[in-house]
């Protein structure tokens, strides 16, 4: 299998909605919902009858495709909903990525941009989005077979970058993030139809139990947990700093953790964490002196591009939900 060498931050011609058989209804989400039953309803006004709903989509869809992941690794991903690959990148290549991250995060021109998020109590950048557009080096990393090729094996088709970002959790000051399924947000607020997406997080600093590593509930990807509460207008402006809507109930989390437990993959810088779009995850605050950072790509399948949002008045800005034909110019 050969991943296309064309960088994902360049323009590629794809069919527009008007040319596609599954074009969304132009009359908006209500008209669409009237015609297509939502398999994953969320942002509900009343508590759901069932605590969770069974997943309707396969987890690993590209076993027949060649790529960097072995059958055993695909089996582990299918079973747990995530896979950690230690030491994917090392040496000079890793150091160059760290320097690139520092240059991006210290660029004062990004401080007041919509695509940067600062710590709630400071002006230090916590997350920087659209990084595969901002950085040619990271754009190439998004196309690297070790990363995009693995995503292709999991989602079963050619990927495009739905979202990219750098996360930085400083020592002593890095805040935590509540439990959530990324797919719940992407479905409700971006209009992602199905669970044909995977996240790839390359850790740029050592991850240990004290610096707020990502915690995941293995097996939770097989269940969709509907969440209560309507989506506020421009919810992304607050949710990127502290998520309050789209959070599973304590009852659902308690049951899932009792059944599956919690795991927090740890390791040296350069490891790659792949996790399913629906795997429930969270992170604690970083109370250690050691910062934690990663570069993060969400790969979505071409035929799963976003439509009208299922539980929001309008889609989030494109720096959070790129299109397959997205161009880099707005970010440079």
Task: Identify the residue ranges that each predicted region occupies.
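Double-stranded beta-helix
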Residues: 209-279
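Short, solvent-exposed loop/turn segments at secondary-structure junctions
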Residues: 89-91, 166-169, 173, 184, ...
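Non-heme Fe(II)-dependent double-stranded beta-helix
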Residues: 6-80, 86-179, 183-190, 310, ...
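Internal hydrophobic scaffold segments of catalytic domains
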Residues: 90-95, 99, 198, 204-227
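Catalytic core of Fe(II)/2-oxoglutarate
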Residues: 251-316
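Short, conserved beta-strand element in jelly-roll/cupin
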Residues: 154, 187-209, 266-269, 274, ...
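A short secondary-structure junction signal
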Residues: 175-181, 188-190, 210-216, 225-229, ...
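Generic beta-strand structural signal
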Residues: 157-164, 175, 194-202, 212, ...
């Amino acid at each position: 299998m050969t991943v296309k060498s064309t960088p994902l931050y360049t323009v590629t011609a794809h069919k527009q909605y008007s040319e596609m058989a599954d074009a969304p209804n132009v009359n908006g989400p209500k008209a669409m919902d009237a015609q297509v039953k939502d398999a994953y309803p969320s942002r509900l006004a009343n508590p759901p009858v069932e605590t969770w709903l069974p997943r309707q989509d396969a987890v690993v869809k590209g076993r027949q495709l060649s790529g960097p992941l072995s059958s055993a690794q695909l089996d582990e991903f299918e079973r747990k909903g995530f896979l950690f690959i230690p030491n994917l990148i090392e040496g000079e290549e890793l150091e160059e990525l760290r320097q690139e991250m520092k240059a991006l995060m210290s660029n004062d021109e990004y401080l007041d941009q919509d695509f940067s998020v600062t710590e709630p109590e400071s002006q230090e950048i916590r997350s920087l989005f659209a990084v595969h557009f901002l950085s040619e080096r990271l754009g190439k990393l998004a196309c690297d077979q070790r990363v995009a090729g693995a995503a292709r094996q999991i989602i079963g088709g050619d990927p495009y970058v739905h979202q990219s970002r750098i996360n930085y959790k400083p020592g002593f000051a890095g805040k935590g993030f509540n439990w959530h399924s990324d797919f719940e947000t992407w479905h409700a607020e971006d209009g992602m139809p199905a669970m044909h997406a995977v996240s790839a997080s390359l850790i740029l600093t050592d991850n240990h139990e004290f610096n707020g590593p990502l915690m995941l509930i293995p097996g939770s990807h097989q269940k969709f947990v509907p969440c209560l509460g309507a989506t506020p207008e421009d919810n992304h402006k607050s949710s990127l700093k502290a998520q309050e809507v789209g959070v599973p109930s304590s009852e659902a989390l308690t049951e899932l953790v009792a059944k599956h437990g919690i795991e927090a993959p740890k390791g040296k810088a350069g490891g790659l964490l792949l996790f399913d779009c629906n795997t429930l995850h969270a992170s604690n605050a970083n109370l250690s002196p050691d910062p934690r950072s990663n570069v993060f790509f969400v790969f979505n399948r071409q035929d799963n591009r976003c439509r009208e949002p299922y539980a929001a008045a309008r889609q989030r800005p494109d720096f959070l939900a790129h299109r397959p034909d997205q161009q880099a110019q707005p970010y440079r």
